[in-house]
Amino acid sequence: MTIMRKNHPLLKLVNSSFIDLPTPSNISSWWNFGSLLGVCLIMQILTGLFLAMHYTSDTATAFSSVTHICRDVNYGWLIRYLHANGASMFFICMFIHVGRGIYYGSYMLSETWNIGIILLLTTMATAFVGYVLPWGQMSFWGATVITNLLSAIPYIGTTLVEWIWGGFSVDKATLTRFFAFHFILPFIITAFVLVHLLFLHETGSNNPSGLNSDSDKIPFHPYYTIKDLLGVLLLLMVLMILVLFFPDVLGDPDNYTPANPLNTPAHIKPEWYFLFAYAILRSIPNKLGGVLALILSILVLALFPLINSSKQHGLVYRPITQTIYWIFIANLLILTWIGGQPVEYPFTTIGQIASIMYFSIIIIFMPMASMIENDILKLHY
């Protein structure tokens, strides 16, 4: 079996990726989130597939079909809530994964990092089009507001929006194409995941010390397979508590009202995992400026490998940058909170300050702190 595992054309790919992969011996539980994201992706594809068997992408029947899934399909309620809350778990894992990458300097593996940013954007797109499918009030108005942002693009904006809508408003054509996008995008994500892993295995994993670990590697199996399995069990436990006890805690009550183009909800807001970006969008009074800030809030991550001036890998031995990093995380939480609040004083002002802080920390304060630390340690080589 050992020979077959190492020589078989298909099995040797699995072997070199998950069994005999040389892995740093000191990677902590923060490195578990990659495998958890893989589990989330597989779970989302499977639950989504079963939901697609019963869902109809037609404005007249979409809302009813979701109700039918929850009421009449065997364990349909379970599949539906696993899918909805699974998306939340997916984003929690993804945010932690990115946060770990920033903390431990994993962005220096630039190809892996850039594919990761593409993955984040694609996942956000998938979640957005998926949120439209139940055809509740927040689905409809979320789709209307967010797609309408494209009209801020000079000259071609309005034409582009109507082209995406397939008409003059969000309607049957929009819902049908969003369902098509929502079905195909997870498979595109899976392809990007394979490229992400390909680039990661070219260089090998980073580790908490930030030092070269070539002299201290252990095989992935059994050490990290068992460690990842523990992570998966904890993830599933949290997910099942969410699904079975608090299935609607992360959703919006407005989405239990069928979509009505004649009645606007009091507060239009996206799912919790988009609130930080939504707060940044709203903090700029100009439409085009807001759209650019929204896009840059994710694309700014691509600057990390370029503006890193530290002579050390990661923040483990850099107390000044560490402090700034945790301020950045707190700032993100403030943005998430503001994104869910109404557009009025003092929330607008707090949102504007937090948005300025978000970009300033990444572009100004972190590089400055790195230079100060280099100077303190006299690392001028």
UniProtKB/Swiss-Prot annotation:
Localization (cell): Mitochondrion inner membrane
SUPFAM superfamilies reported in the protein's UniProt record: a domain/subunit of cytochrome bc1 complex (Ubiquinol-cytochrome c reductase) (SSF81648), Transmembrane di-heme cytochromes (SSF81342)
Gene Ontology terms for molecular function: metal ion binding; ubiquinol-cytochrome-c reductase activity
Binding annotation for heme b b566: 97, 196
Keywords carried by this UniProt record: Electron transport, Heme, Iron, Membrane, Metal-binding, Mitochondrion, Mitochondrion inner membrane, Respiratory chain, Transmembrane, Transmembrane helix, Transport, Ubiquinone
Signal peptide residue numbers: none
InterPro entries: Cyt_b/b6_C (IPR005798), Cyt_b/b6_C_sf (IPR036150), Cyt_b/b6_N (IPR005797), Cytb/b6-like_sf (IPR027387), Cytochrome_b (IPR030689), Cytochrome_b_C_euk/bac (IPR048260), Cytochrome_b_N_euk/bac (IPR048259), Di-haem_cyt_TM (IPR016174)
Gene Ontology CC entries for this record: mitochondrial inner membrane; respiratory chain complex III
Oligomer and partners: The cytochrome bc1 complex contains 11 subunits: 3 respiratory subunits (MT-CYB, CYC1 and UQCRFS1), 2 core proteins (UQCRC1 and UQCRC2) and 6 low-molecular weight proteins (UQCRH/QCR6, UQCRB/QCR7, UQCRQ/QCR8, UQCR10/QCR9, UQCR11/QCR10 and a cleavage product of UQCRFS1). This cytochrome bc1 complex then forms a dimer.
UniProt record similarity statement: Belongs to the cytochrome b family.
Protein name: Cytochrome b
Organism encoding this protein: Phyllotis limatus
Name of the gene encoding the protein in the UniProt record: MT-CYB
